[in-house]
Design a protein with these regions (language model features):
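Short, flexible active-site-adjacent loop segments at beta-strand->alpha-helix junctions, enriched
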Residues: 9, 61, 120-121
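N-terminal low-complexity, Ser/Thr- and acidic-residue-enriched intrinsically disordered segments
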Residues: 1-54
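Charged, often glycine-rich, active-site loop that binds/positions anionic groups
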Residues: 48-73
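Short helix-loop boundary/capping segments at the starts of domains
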Residues: 31-38, 57-64, 107
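Alpha-helical structural motif
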Residues: 21, 51-54, 59, 94, ...
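A general structural signal for well-ordered alpha-helical segments in protein cores
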Residues: 22, 64, 95-98
Length: 310
């Protein structure tokens, strides 16, 4: 299991959970490497260049210029942060981590999981940021996967953040990305959208037990044969209504089902704020649970892949 991250993920001067927590998760990966075998890697130079090119191609030129220069400030700070030069670096490196993970994951034919400690993605569309999100690495990653031949059928974006992924829906709709479907389970109606076709949005108001039942039902209803890549936006902000243990069970359900379907998966971080967890360390620990859940699935994949290669 390889998780992508470098210190440019935390380049912005603006200190907020979204711009700082990935470093703590990265520290946990390094500290536990000998025990878990999970590797931390920086996005490769070729993917940094590819990410910058994709951002320049897919995003509105006015928004790209604003992210680079801070002008106009209303657009440059549309993500909710004060602009500084680190915003652009963060956007490029965070996006590069997603596409690097997609590239590496697709190379394994019997289902596999990799991740990027990218966060602040799904409220941004291709014209502006919103809700602490700057560049939508989910949508950019899906575009990269399809156009580079890593997903020859369709890409499924599973978004289990507390809030709706309206930015993702706007992005893929405005660019006519009909090879992307979105499965969105939220606990809060912020950034909601009208789901049509193969897209689905469920806003769940119940308790933890019914939430996990909803996760299982939604995963069971997916036409998995339609897809050859899954991108998982692993939000931890359904907490505190959903406990830390409940979120871990949810991640196990997601990764187990993807394993059963022998599909490649790339996950990113989402949600998770000190306002509901108490400390940034608790936020990082909960995100790390997602990393550990993905590693447990790889323990199941390894013997399966080995037997298939005999």
């Amino acid at each position: 299991l390889t998780i992508y991250w470098d210190n440019k993920y935390v380049a912005p001067e603006h200190a907020f959970d979204t711009t700082r927590k990935s470093e703590l998760v990265a520290d946990l990966i390094v500290e536990t490497h000998e025990e878990t075998g999970i590797a931390l890697a920086a996005p490769k130079i070729e993917f940094l260049g590819k990410a910058e090119s994709l951002i320049e191609t897919l995003l509105d030129p006015k928004y790209v210029e604003a992210l680079r220069t801070g002008v106009p400030i209303s657009l440059a700070s549309s993500n909710g942060f004060e602009w500084d030069e680190g915003i652009w670096d963060m956007a490029v490196h965070s996006t590069a981590g997603v596409i690097n993970a997609i590239y590496e994951t697709e190379k394994r034919p019997f289902g596999s999981v990799n991740g990027s400690l990218s966060s602040g993605l799904h409220h941004a569309d291709n014209k502006r940021g919103m809700g602490f999100c700057t560049v939508n690495g989910l949508a950019v990653g899906a575009y990269y996967a399809h156009t580079e031949g890593h997903a020859k059928k369709k890409v499924l974006i599973i978004d289990f953040d507390a809030h709706c992924g309206g930015g993702t829906m706007s992005f893929i709709t405005s660019l006519g990305m009909d090879w992307v479907d979105q499965l969105d389970l939220s606990t809060n109606g912020f950034d909601s959208y009208v789901a049509a076709g193969n897209h689905e949005l469920v806003i769940h108001r119940g308790d933890e037990r019914s939430y996990l039942q909803e996760v299982w039902s939604l995963l069971d209803a997916v036409e998995w044969d339609d897809y050859d890549l899954v991108l998982y936006n692993a939000g931890i902000d359904p907490h505190p209504r959903i406990s830390v243990n409940g979120l871990a069970q949810r991640d196990e359900l997601v990764f187990n089902r993807i394993f059963q379907e022998t599909l490649p998966c790339v996950f990113v971080l989402a949600g998770g704020y000190t306002s509901s967890y108490g400390t940034i360390e608790e936020v990082a620990d909960t995100h790390f649970n997602t990393v550990l859940a993905s590693e447990r699935i790889l323990d199941l994949i390894r013997p399966f892949a080995s037997s298939k290669s005999l």
